[in-house]
């Protein structure tokens, strides 16, 4: 299957207006996303189809166990403790059912796409969002904000 990146890019540009939220930043996986990330960072001018949109702060999230372990562990703990809330989403639940975690030699936990039982993209995107949230808490202002996974 192929993906129409223009549809995804437009969806992201329209999130603020559609949901009444403020996008604080976008974390992305380098694989197949560099062009989109550059467009999101630069923003877009108004045209007959779309209003103008300011650029966003974008940050590559390295897809490595040493980077994603803290977010994966915290998300797992939040789910286990019943502290994780989300909008009803059957596809996200299926992605969680498919996900298989493994540990590297340093006991860093990560979702292993090759060992998973099917699609896990939404879970990985959620882990990336949790990573961004943790980075903001550690290095940015202590803002109260959440994440949306598309």
Where are the language model's segments positioned?
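RNase H-like, metal-dependent nuclease domains and their acidic two-metal-ion catalytic environment used
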Residues: 1-63, 69, 73, 86-150
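Short, surface-exposed amphipathic charged segments that create phosphate/polyanion-binding patches used
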Residues: 71-81
């Amino acid at each position: 299957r192929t993906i129409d990146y223009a549809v995804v890019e437009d969806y992201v540009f329209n999130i603020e207006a559609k949901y009444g939220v403020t996008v604080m930043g976008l974390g992305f996986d380098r694989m197949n996303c560099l062009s989109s990330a550059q467009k999101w960072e630069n923003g877009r001018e108004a045209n007959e189809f779309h209003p103008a949109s300011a650029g966003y702060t974008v940050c590559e999230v390295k897809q490595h166990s040493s980077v994603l372990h803290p977010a994966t562990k915290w998300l797992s703990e939040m789910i286990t403790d019943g502290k994780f809330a989300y909008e009803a989403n059957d596809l996200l639940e299926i992605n969680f059912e498919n996900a298989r975690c493994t540990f590297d030699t340093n006991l860093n936990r990560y979702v292993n796409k090759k060992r998973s039982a099917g699609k896990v993209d939404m879970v990985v995107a959620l882990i990336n969002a949790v990573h961004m949230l943790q980075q903001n808490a550690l290095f940015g202002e202590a803002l109260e904000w959440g994440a949306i996974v598309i």
